[in-house]
């Protein structure tokens, strides 16, 4: 009996022991996030003296072992310290790292010293694919004779210690496919002999130091990290033959200095937030064999100088927003074997570019706007973009006088530069916060088809990056409205712009690709950001170049999101062209994104957004995929290929852009179309990223309404867009109030808008809005035509704030009620959109309210989305086209008009209740009535953003 009882406990113990052993081995094979964090803490504790080593460290270590020379002793100290930093070594790579014979250690290579051939030293370390988990201790700085350091495809984490700067003979440094974090490893800048730098597939972040291109490097692999900045202009000094920027968060333009890279053979930009037109200097890259700029936010036409790429074998421009004609000069390049230009907006191609036209060359023209070709975008998606192509001769990126990396500037210089704008600015300021709510408009982004892409474009456009995503919350956007003046003239054209929105869509098409488009936006936003604050002032002067003005605008509004606001600002300018004001709205969206975005990037392309390991903590697993990249030989290509898709993630950031389209809704006639946008649904995804931002601005609710408030007084008139819904003839009752007080009321509206999308909506609502906004754009243009004239005087009518409230939903009626009002400012308000107002407009300043401008508002968003077209959008604030002519008339009443824009904004949201806000707008007018059109206008402008819903203003 005793023996049996003894066996039982023993058996249990044996089982427990086996279980423990199995767990141990399992844990050794995987590195959890907690373990990675633990390793990082251990490294930080080991990094004394700021990660550097004391000069006398070898004397501090007492060794009884004998070494052939002091350099091998130092190597022994370094390698033993490193072995202790190994947390997991599944292949027992360091099992024989014992004893003084360091040259026999696995992965360690010795050679005669360069300065003394009689001395044997450790010259190289190669632990590629060893799957070791650990960190780099500062003692590695003792390996001063190492020229080759390869540790790719492991699980090393933490930072690159500063002590490695002592490895002055470093020739090849490969730490790819690990889990390193922190800024760019600047120790690489201190190695005079470095030729090969491979840090891809890690989690390095921040800006890329310009000095990296001053070094005599042959290969630079930066792909699949978290770098976010513009590409330094110093790139032209680089002697590298291979450079990969893929799957990061780079934004802005491709520097024109790229044409000076005479040794360049391969360059890859896949999956970033780059935007604008391609610089003509690319044609000077005579030795390039691979050029990949896919999944970004590039716009305009392909430069004719590409015919100078005599040695190019592969070119990929897919998932962007290129337009125009693909010529024979490119497709007949002598060594070209693969040319992909799918998922863009090309509307023509030479016969030699048609897939299947050549047995030796492969072409892909899928998802463009080509007639008589299969698998192309719908006319609805193409019209907005193709009808307003980006003029690269005026684009900053292509060397023109345009504004900023965003192509948007180029769009419409037409601009009226309405003087009213000025006044508007002030109003905007106050309302700004409200406008933020506009974000909800973002949903509208849906710009019909593009929906996903669409939003991404928008964002990028304005903000250039990042902010867009965040959240439009930054009420700021409204602020920009004032700026709109600049844009204004363009706005008139706006009608067309609206269409562009779809453009983003194209990316969407891709579904997975969608992301790419986004990126584009982000980039755009970035550049603008800086300018934004200044921009606001210029607005007026910018008139001509509306495109840029938008950017500036943002600054005004809210420190945080200013960039986005810029867009809005153009609208302001237009005053008469209220539509422009809408523009600002889009920015809003973008702004928030910006934070993200950049990351998020070109949406469509890579739905893969996840793509980059960015998401999770660097430590997470994402790194594994590239394991082998390390190998130098492949390094060049392999990394890139994977990156291709990963980049997409960043694009999401831009979802905001979609809002851009909302402006179109103002059209009124389009109202029905408004809903067609449903597709935009996709945009929502991106929004999530920013959704948080919206919370920030409790205003969210105001999201849409805010915009309206700004302009509401005057806007009411324009609510035209909303008019669709505006049935709120009630607004008309306000007519009596015509007084211009409207401006003050503007704030009132902010509340209504919120209801529409309220912050949350931004996150998800974006999708819904998209649905409507797109269609409207198409029609919106026409309506605007009339509203502008009336706007001039209409502002006063808006005064009656009371009406606005009720109008919130009545929107439908408003559309036509305006006609009656022509005579009186108020009546027009509703129909503002309707032509009736136009007639009266001339006489009644109120109509002048260019309620339509609001439409543009939503468009604003679009501008970003456009990214490549962004310019177009800007100018195009949906209604503007028609209004353009009228604009002038409105100018007189200009101030009122400012308000109108606000309303328009509501329109964007139109699909949602948002239209209601527009009514609110009306109320404000009553207050300011006597004051003077001038003051009124400014206030309205501010809100232009949010008003999406307001369409209903009867006054107009």
Swiss-Prot record:
SUPFAM superfamilies in the cross-refs: L domain-like
Post-translational modification: Hydroxylated on proline residues in the S-P-P-P-P repeat. O-glycosylated on hydroxyprolines.
Pfam families: LRR_1, LRRNT_2
Record field: compositional bias (Polar residues): 355-377, 837-852
Organ and tissue specificity: Expressed in flowers, stamen, pollen, and pollinated carpels.
Residues listed as glycosylation sites in the UniProt record: 273, 287, 338
Keywords: Cell wall, Cell wall biogenesis/degradation, Glycoprotein, Hydroxylation, Leucine-rich repeat, Repeat, Secreted, Signal
Ranges of the LRR repeats in the UniProt entry: 39-59, 60-84, 119-143, 144-166, 168-191, 192-215, 217-238, 240-261, 262-285, 287-309, 310-332
Compositionally biased tracts (Basic and acidic residues): 431-441, 452-534
Protein's name according to its UniProt entry: Pollen-specific leucine-rich repeat extensin-like protein 1
Organism: Arabidopsis thaliana (Mouse-ear cress)
